[in-house]
């Protein structure tokens, strides 16, 4: 297995400078990662650096809290694509999930999928804030709406990916959707364990350590 093919390299800290971004993307090119995930304002910069590679760009949407309206999320996705992204990592409305307002959760997923049928869409649940039943329900709604990935975490809450959550998500989505693990993945061994548990993408900023 080539672990680099699973890696979504992330640089999402708010104080990342252009110098840091350039160095990070250069490392991503050397390591030949699958995708680079950045904030919307940095997409164009990354696109220029990787223009002669096969690396994808994913833009984050309503990150990290997910509390924008669906209309705003759709507009942000449009802007990400205009700037050069070809994948999207959007944060679900966590409040609606905790309220068990599944109609609103479904409506958001449905409107986003129907608006963008031909790009890879990953939905972030922030699993550390959810019960097992809530994770299951979110996965079922994601599958129903044909989202491409269910994703564990933003990396900005109290905990990141766990083996248990990845196994649970994989069990629910089966082969109808894929699982992305992210948050707190700082070693190669942990990344490999998550892949073994069912993750098909690994989101990490620790590229040198994970791909050593």
UniProtKB/Swiss-Prot annotation:
Q: So where's the catalytic machinery, residue-wise?
A: 89 (proton donor/acceptor), 151 (schiff-base intermediate with acetaldehyde), 180 (proton donor/acceptor)
A single Gene Ontology MF term assigned here is: deoxyribose-phosphate aldolase activity
One Gene Ontology term, aspect cellular component: cytoplasm
Q: Which domain of life is it from?
A: Bacteria
Q: Keywords on this record?
A: Cytoplasm, Lyase, Schiff base
SUPFAM superfamilies on file = Aldolase (SSF51569)
Lyase found in the keyword field: yes
Question: Its Gene Ontology biological processes?
Answer: 2-deoxyribose 1-phosphate catabolic process; carbohydrate catabolic process; deoxyribonucleotide catabolic process
Q: Which family does it belong to?
A: Belongs to the DeoC/FbaB aldolase family. DeoC type 1 subfamily.
This protein is called Deoxyribose-phosphate aldolase 2
């Amino acid at each position: 297995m080539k672990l680099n093919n699973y890696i979504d390299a992330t640089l999402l800290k708010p104080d990342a400078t252009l110098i840091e971004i350039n160095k990070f993307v250069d490392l991503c090119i050397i390591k030949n990662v699958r995708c680079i995930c950045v904030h919307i304002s940095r997409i164009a910069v990354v696109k220029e650096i990787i223009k002669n590679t096969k690396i994808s760009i994913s833009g984050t949407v309503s990150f990290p809290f997910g509390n924008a309206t669906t209309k705003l999320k759709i507009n942000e996705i449009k802007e990400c694509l205009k700037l050069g992204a070809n994948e999207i990592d959007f944060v679900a409305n966590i409040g609606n999930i905790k309220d068990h307002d599944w109609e609103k959760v479904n409506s958001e997923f449905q409107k986003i999928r129907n608006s963008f049928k031909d790009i890879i869409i990953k939905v972030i649940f922030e699993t550390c804030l959810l019960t097992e039943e809530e994770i299951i329900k979110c996965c079922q709604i994601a599958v129903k709406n044909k989202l491409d990935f269910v994703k564990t975490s933003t990396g900005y809450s109290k905990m990141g990916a766990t083996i248990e959550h990845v196994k649970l998500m994989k069990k629910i989505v089966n082969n109808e959707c894929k699982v992305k693990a992210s948050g707190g993945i700082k070693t190669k061994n942990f990344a490999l364990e998550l892949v073994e548990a069912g993750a098909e993408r690994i989101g990490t900023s620790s590229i040198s350590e994970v791909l050593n």
